[in-house]
Every structure is written in C-alpha cells, then in structure tokens.
C-alpha cells in the first residue's frame, strides 16, 4: 500500500513494508540519513547513504568514521557513477538506497545496526552496509565494488593512534589502538575473493580510477602514461592474513588518517544478481572478541531478518489505533525510535540525551522516557531507574545526570531540581503498570528519601524553593536549564507542580508498603503544597501562574510553555486549566510544528537563542500540551499530535529532518529543525500522550479507561498494552449516543458508558487483514464481540472468516448475531444460528466508521 499527502510540496511516499510503516523518497530529498543503534552502539548515516560513524557506548567515543562503497569497471578501473535519481527507503529497522550505475546496473545499499536478542545481536557494536547488484542489461557485467572505511576518526574519537594489524582470512581488516591494544576495530566483508589494503591518503575515495596491482598492466592506456607504482596517485599497503603491524617505513601513518579499503571483483551474469555485505564493528576487550563478533555477524541475512522481526515485536506493544493514520504511524515510529536508543552502558541500562555525541544520562529524560517505555518495555524502565537509585545523594536529591561510561555525577549545585520529583513519579508509574512488588520493595526507600528531601526544601510559604544563585545550568532548576546567563530559581511553578504530584504518588507507594503514617504524612504535605502553589504562584492580574518568584522575592509573570505543568500534574483548577489551554492555543504560541517555548509576541522572544528555549519550538512540549488538552479539548489534542508528526514526515529537505525520526527543536519562524535528528526522549512522550491522553489510560489503584475522542472520531482502540503481567486490549466506540468500551481486562471508568469485560483477545484467530482496516475480537466462550474500524479516507468493505473462532473457541450452541452500523447508529439483528453455521462476514464501512458484530449464546 502506498500513500502520499495530496498537494504536499515533497515526494515522500508512505508504504507498508515488512509489516511496518516506512517512507520512500527520491535520494536528493534527504539532507541527512537515518540513525540506528542497539545496546552497545549507535550509528548515523549521511544523505548519500554512507555510514557516518560508529559510536561505542562502552567507550563513549567514535571508533570508526565514515564508511562507503564506490564502483569501478573491473578491467579499466574507471569509476562508475550513479545515473539519474535513486530512492531511499526509510524503515524502522533499516535504510535502503536504490539507484542505477552508468552501465545500467541496479544497486541496492542497505544500512542497519543488528538489533535482536537472539545470539545477543543487540549487543554487537557493529553496522552493516549491505550490497545487492542486479544486472538487467544484455551483457555480462564485470565491476569492482570497493568499500572504504575511516579506521582512525578524529571527531569525538579515541586517541588517534589506531593502527592496522592484519587482514583476517583476507576479508577482515583488523585495527587497534597503540595505547589500548584491546580496543579493536574490524572492517570486513562476506564476499569471496576480497582484497584488503589501506592507505593514509583520504583522496583515495575520490579517485576516478581504481588502481590495484592487478590493473597495472592496463592502466596506461586509460590514463595516458607509462604506468608504474611511482605514477600511482594513491599508495596502498596490501594486507594479508596475520600481517605484522603497520610498517611505518613503508608508509608513514603517524598523525594521519588511516583508510581501510576492501575490493571485491564481481561478474554479474545477464539477468543475475550478486549480494553480500560489508561490516564495521568494534570490541572494547580484545581482537579475539572482535573476530568472534564478525563471524557471528557474517550470517547477514539472518541478522537482517531478526532485526526486522525485533522491530515488529517492539512496535506490537500498546498499539494505538484511531481513524487518523498519521497518529497511528506516529505511535509506531515513536516505539521504533525508542528501540534504537535503549542501551546498556558500563554503569547500567539507560539512554543518552544526545546519541553519538554524549554519554550523559539525564534523570529528567529518563523519567519522561519511562512514562512511555512502560507501555512497551517496563523492564528497561526499572533497570534505568535503578541506576539513579544507586547514585542518589545521601540527602535524597537525584542528580541531573551521570556519565554512562565513567559514572561521574553532576547535580549542578542545585538545592532542588525537577529531576528529583520526576524520578519519584517514574518509579511509581513503572510500579503501577508492572505490579512488581520486588521492584517496589527495592525502590520505596529511595523514593521516600527523595520525597523527604523535597519536603525539606519548603520555604515559609510552604513552597518548594531553589536557593541556587547561579545562571544557566547552575541557576535554572527546571527543564529549560541550558539557557545561557539566565536564572529560573526560587519558587518555580514547574518544579512545585511536579513536587506536588510526586508527594501524592509516593503516598500511594507508602500505602502499598503498609506504611500508613508515612502515607498520611506525604498526602498531607502534598495537599499543603498544592494550596500554597495556588495561593502564592498565581498572578492575580492574568489568572495564570508566575514563571517563578525568585531569590529576592521578585515575581516573574512571564507566560511561557511552562504553564502546562500545573495542568498536567493536576495543580490547576478546571477554570485555570481552561485559561492556560486557551492561552497556549493561540497563534503566537502554537504552530503546525508544535508549541513555541516563549510566545512570538513576547518582548524576550527569539526563535533560536538558547537552543530554542526562548522562542523556538520543542515538539515534546507540544506533546505535553496535547496531553493537557485531552480531557478539556480533545480536538486540540488530536490536531497537535497530527501536526507535529506530519512535521517529521514531510519535506525533509527544507525541514532538516529524517522521515519518521523525532528530531529535537525547530527555529521559531522557519520551523526548520536546528537540533539533533533523533531526540531520544521525545518519542516516549508521544506514546505516553497517545496512551494516556487519547486512549485515556490511568493507572491509579487499578486500570481506568476514559477515552478522549474528538468530535470527528467514532472509535478508538488500544491493543496489547502490558499491564500486571497481562496484555490489555480494548475498543471504544459511540453507540446510540453512549461511548461503549469492550475490553479483555477488568477496568473502571468515570464516563457514563457501557462496559463490556471479556476474557480473551482472540483477534489472531481471524487471519484476513487489510492495512486500512482495524480489527479486534474480544470474547468469552459464550460471547464474542468483533470490532472493525475504518482508517481510510473513503468508504470500503471487508470480508473475513470466523470459522476458527466458531470451531475451536466458542462453546457449541445457538448464538444470536447482531451487527451495529455506525452510519445509522443502530443495531441490526441477524437472528439465531448454530455456531457451526457461522462462517464469516462481509461488512461495509463508512469513512471513519465502524462495525460491531456480537455473537451471544442463547440460554435454552
């Protein structure tokens, strides 16, 4: 299936490939390539499809630089260049570049990082650059595919003393650092008859002639000289098995780039194809381990298949399905982005806020990540939070970040921060979804200590007060902490709102622990804090909250995006919440790309200063704003979620994005991305907004479902949500003016609706599927409800069999069959039949509509 945005000023197509949504676009429309990672590495690519770097999470350094492939005529050595425009396929698991060479050969280069639990592929610090050559011409084609790799990168890299050691089995170049010989890189191929060499001349990659010893005799007639080694523009050192270390007398490598080179000569028959791969990788422990990793990765087809399957698996959890395919894709890609950055550092599980540039793991980001990650991989959330527990200060403060490699901790000398309450909230959220009592018992002392510390920072008014008098990270205790020469200290509304929610949350954990007195204490402190916030931090002139009341008692009435925090954390009254949402929903704040951090009409607005924190657009703030609108204005929530993800899909050339990747921040006027191409903590916020905002999931003392449907929607669904060791699926729809909810797990709701609790999700027993049709089948052996939703922009029909349900699941007997038609908002009774006579259904579906098919066993 292929989709495109009508009237869009770009050529991005949307396709379903390998059971996931992917993007297809001309290869001249990217300004940067995709990014992929696993537990031990992260790799970026360029707009050309070349690998840009391989970053080791164990070292926190780039270990291999750019890797690319060039093509030459095998007899003359003349460079064969791309002809015409090619295509990129941007898939959650890989990036494929398809193009033609001068002779009409069709090339596919595929870049991916192995990421699957089988054989610990997700712990292999390596990247593939695969190659498929198809000959559609009328002649046998002989070409040389030559891959080059920078084995001594300098940007954020190890010490520049990597040396080439030898070529293992004549197809893998081995290099290691002189100062740390255990740090071993490999650059190899699965192709037969490879020739390995290296050079210190970076111009080799740009040479229009492929000059190797086997071509010496024929090069003269092409370059017009009596060819000899002295005339060669690039000097290579050939490598053989177990060669000695680099001979500096033969080729001086001191302080010079080292370019590994692997040549594969290929003869492609008419109508035939050749396929193999190049692999770059690293071991922080030994050359032997590096070679074992390479040999594991040689089965590249299996690694490719398992990596795709793993992404399909990761995205199968908490599937949010709505009539709006843009939001559906956004949720899928959010989970795919998260799967690329979940890592295992020397210090433990976590993720950096700046992949391939930093190893710092921020508590704030980890907390927000867990709110979304809990709906996909709660075990990762647990392990990531446990690291912060281990590094917690003696007084209870949670530091701003730790370094995942060294374990160094920095709290920026703040007396209070947003990290501490967010850590508490994250631990509680993870416990609520997992019901893991071992995790609770391990983490409760830490969160209670953190809560006690929060309370200790109250001032005489009962407000949480930051006494740090610095600027930037040393004087801003909230999330916008990297604004230079700026302070947000004292009583900060953002942090106070988070602390209220944290104290209320830790009271809940105290209840579970049977610590009744502590629970009552935390609950009372939370109530007092909320009252103090609404007494001292509301601006009587505007009815909105102050940004902060600083160390000198000055009230800062700045209206910024931070107004969302009292709404999100239930500090604001309904009336104040409506006032805040209305203010943020105005054009000087809200754009098609997201929410400006400071309104365009403010005196201190600037579209890009301070990393966009004084007027730029941070999409994750828009996700939080969308969540805050969920119960007040769901139509606004949906428009924001749709618009922000479309910004990630459309026009990557002008917006400096990669389709499907959640980039960081935009210029407040041009809406062009100025930040990182994949911001790790944005995707989980989008997922969190979809699950808790759109689908209305709440975890407080049990499962609550209160969907927030905009006026234009008739249904919404959530499938396979992890909860207390089970998988929750529900379908909610408007039936005769009432929102009916069908679910396979006991739940409560505050809506005036009909609840139908069934035992099992038996959707897998219906095998017919259409990409634009959503189907959920929930049942007990005597009661089956099949829910079918239309996601297309037109009316459609769908035919499917239920024979496996009626023959293997349902209790034998007579069943009344009813069908609900959304277009007429009424049920149609199809009579009573024996289950053996119920074989299938064919339904018509209106735009955005649904059908319910109910089979109820009759009592005789």
Locations of regions flagged by a protein language model:
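An extended acidic
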Residues: 2-102, 184-241, 307-319, 323, ...
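C-terminal capping/lid segments that line or modulate ligand- or cofactor-binding pockets
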Residues: 2-63, 338, 358-361, 413-430, ...
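Non-catalytic C-terminal accessory modules of carbohydrate-active enzymes
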Residues: 63-65, 72-110, 115-117, 627-829, ...
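Polysaccharide-binding surfaces and accessory modules of carbohydrate-active proteins
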Residues: 107-243, 260-262, 302-310, 317, ...
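Aromatic-rich carbohydrate-recognition surfaces in CAZymes
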Residues: 135, 174-175, 266-268, 274, ...
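Short Pro-Gly-centered flexible turn/kink motifs
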Residues: 141-144, 185, 265-289, 846-855
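Extended glycan-interaction surfaces of carbohydrate-active proteins
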Residues: 321-360, 383-415, 456-491, 531-619, ...
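Inter-helical turn/loop segments and adjacent helix faces that build the functional surface
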Residues: 430-442, 505-521
């Amino acid at each position: 299936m292929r989709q495109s945005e009508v009237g869009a000023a770009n050529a991005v197509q949307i396709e379903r490939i390998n059971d996931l949504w992917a993007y297809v676009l001309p290869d001249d429309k990217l300004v940067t390539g995709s990014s992929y990672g696993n537990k031990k590495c992260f790799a970026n690519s360029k707009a050309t499809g070349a690998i840009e770097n391989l970053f080791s999470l164990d070292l926190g350094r780039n270990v291999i630089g750019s890797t690319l492939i060039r093509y030459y005529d095998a007899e003359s050595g003349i460079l064969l260049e791309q002809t015409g425009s090619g295509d990129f396929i941007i898939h959650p698991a890989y990036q494929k570049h398809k193009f033609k060479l001068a002779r009409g050969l069709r090339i596919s280069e595929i870049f991916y990082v192995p990421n699957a639990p089988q054989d610990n592929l997700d712990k292999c610090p390596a990247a593939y650059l695969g190659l498929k050559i198809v000959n559609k011409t009328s002649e046998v084609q002989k070409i040389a595919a030559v891959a080059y790799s920078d084995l001594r990168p300098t940007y954020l890299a190890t010490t520049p003393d990597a040396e080439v050691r030898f070529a293992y089995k004549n197809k893998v170049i081995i290099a290691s650092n002189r100062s740390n010989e255990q740090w071993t890189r490999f650059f190899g191929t699965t192709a037969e008859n490879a020739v390995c060499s290296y050079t210190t001349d970076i111009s080799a990659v740009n040479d229009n002639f492929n000059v190797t010893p086997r071509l010496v005799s024929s090069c003269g007639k092409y370059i017009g000289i009596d060819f000899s080694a002295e005339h060669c523009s690039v000097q290579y050192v050939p490598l053989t098995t177990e060669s000695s270390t680099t001979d500096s007398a033969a080729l001086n490598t001191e302080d010079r780039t080292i370019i590994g080179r692997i040549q594969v000569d290929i003869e492609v028959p008419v109508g035939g194809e050749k396929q193999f791969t190049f692999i770059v990788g690293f071991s922080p422990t030994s050359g032997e381990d590096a070679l074992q990793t390479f040999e594991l990765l040689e089965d590249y087809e299996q690694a490719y298949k398992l990596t795709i399957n793993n992404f399909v698996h990761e995205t199968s959890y908490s599937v949010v399905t709505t009539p709006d395919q843009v939001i559906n894709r956004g949720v899928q890609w959010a989970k795919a982005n998260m799967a690329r950055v979940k890592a295992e550092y020397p210090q433990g599980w976590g993720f950096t806020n700046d992949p391939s540039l930093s190893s710092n793991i921020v508590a704030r980001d980890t907390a927000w990540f867990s709110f979304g990650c809990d709906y996909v991989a709660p075990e990762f959330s647990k392990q990531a939070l446990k690291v912060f527990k281990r590094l917690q200060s003696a007084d209870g403060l949670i530091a701003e970040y730790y370094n995942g490699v060294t374990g160094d901790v920095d709290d920026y000398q703040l007396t209070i921060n947003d990290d501490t309450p967010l850590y508490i909230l994250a631990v509680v959220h993870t416990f609520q979804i997992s019901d893991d009592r071992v995790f609770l018992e391990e983490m409760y002392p830490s969160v209670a200590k953190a809560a006690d510390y929060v309370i200790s920072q109250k001032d005489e008014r009962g407000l949480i007060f930051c006494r740090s008098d610095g600027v930037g990270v040393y004087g801003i205790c909230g999330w916008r902490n990297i604004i230079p020469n700026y302070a947000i200290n004292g009583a900060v509304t953002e942090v106070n709102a988070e602390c209220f929610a944290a104290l209320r949350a830790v009271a809940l954990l105290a209840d579970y622990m049977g610590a009744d007195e502590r629970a009552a204490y935390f609950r009372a402190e939370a109530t007092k804090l909320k009252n103090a916030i609404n007494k001292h931090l509301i601006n009587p002139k505007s009815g909105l909250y102050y940004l902060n009341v600083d160390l000198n008692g000055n009230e800062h009435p700045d209206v910024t995006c931070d107004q969302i925090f009292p709404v999100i954390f239930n500090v604001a009254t309904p009336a104040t919440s409506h006032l805040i949402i209305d203010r943020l929903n105005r054009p000087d704040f809200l754009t098609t790309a997201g929410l400006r951090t400071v309104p365009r009409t403010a005196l201190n607005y600037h579209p890009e200063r301070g990393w966009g924190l004084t007027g730029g657009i941070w999409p994750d703030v828009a996700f939080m704003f969308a969540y805050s609108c969920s119960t007040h204005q769901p139509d606004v929530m949906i428009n924001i979620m749709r618009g922000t993800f479309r910004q990630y899909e459309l026009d990557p050339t002008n917006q400096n994005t990669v389709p499907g990747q959640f980039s960081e921040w935009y210029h407040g006027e041009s809406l062009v991305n100025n930040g990182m191409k994949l911001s790790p903590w944005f995707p989980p916020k989008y997922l969190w907004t979809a699950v808790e905002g759109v689908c209305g999931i709440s975890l407080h003392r049990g499962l609550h479902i209160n969907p927030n449907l905009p006026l234009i929607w008739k249904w919404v669904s959530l499938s396979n949500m992890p909860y207390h060791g089970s998988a929750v699926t529900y379908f909610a729809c408007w039936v005769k003016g009432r929102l009916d909810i069908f679910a396979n797990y006991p739940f409560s709701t505050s809506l005036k609706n009909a609840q139908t609790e069934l035992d099992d999700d038996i959707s897998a027993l219906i095998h017919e599927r259409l990409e634009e049709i959503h189907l959920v089948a929930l049942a007990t052996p005597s009661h089956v409800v099949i829910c079918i939703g239309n996601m297309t922009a037109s009316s459609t029909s769908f035919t499917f069999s239920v024979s496996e349900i009626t023959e293997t699941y349902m209790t034998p007997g007579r069943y009344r069959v009813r069908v609900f038609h959304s277009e007429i908002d009424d049920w149609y009774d199809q009579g009573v039949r024996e289950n053996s006579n119920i074989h299938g259904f064919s339904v018509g579906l209106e735009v955005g509509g649904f059908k319910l098919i109910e089979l109820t066993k009759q009592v005789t």
